[in-house]
Amino acid sequence: MYTPPAFKVQHPALALAFAAARGFGLMVSCDGGRPLASPVPFLIEERAGKSPRVTFHVARPNPLAALAERRGTWLMAVSGADAYVSAAWYTSPDQVPTWLYETVHLSGPVAVVPAEHARAHLDALTARFEQGIADPWTTDKVAPAKLEQLMRAIVVIEMLVEDIEGKFKLNQHKNDADHVAVASQLMAEADPAAQTIAARMVALRPQLMYQNPAGVALAALADSGDM
């Protein structure tokens, strides 16, 4: 991923935490000259002295399921909030429009997880995303025969993370006046993603004076994506 130094996430642990908190990304591979990709929920397991492990599953007919048998190197692209920035928002002249965003790329070799571990994967995945639900769903709520049928319909895949790239493009290269102008405008937008980007920008330079006409809860937004 092309990443100018100003936007690079310097600490891999922060980029990994961002991806883990998101828990949803685009898994990308290549079958010869044809790219293949599937959006998937996933779990990240950090292991002492070993590469982090990403686990996810796809439907058995998904071409990625067969491709995983070849144990190639794949890439998981994990995106957070993003927002358009108009050139009219800057205080400095001769600016151009841009897009601000946060993204992390994880890459490494993949392998198919043995079928006997499918239920443990589903249990861990659902436990992660059922947090906060009053009556959380578990695999125990499915009849055993039906659950076996469903598990046979998926293929669990793991990726050992060998490379972590993080890019948070938040106008870090702009002067304070432009930083404040853009962040303040994004706060006023109705789009929650724009407000999240504004909160990230404020967190980068909290000492500056921002306009927050919408009364956006910046602290909560800034904490929602693991800066």
Where would I find each of the regions flagged by the language model?
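A generic local secondary-structure boundary/capping motif
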Residues: L16, D94-Q95, K146-Q149
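Short, structured beta-strand-loop surface elements
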Residues: R60-H121
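Short, basic/aromatic recognition patches
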Residues: Y2-L26
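C-terminal edge-of-domain segments
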Residues: V113-M227
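Residue-level recognition of well-ordered beta-strand positions that form the cores
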Residues: P41, H57, A77, P109, ...
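A generic structural signal for short beta-strands and their flanking turns/coil linkers
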Residues: G23, S38, K50-V54, R70-W74, ...
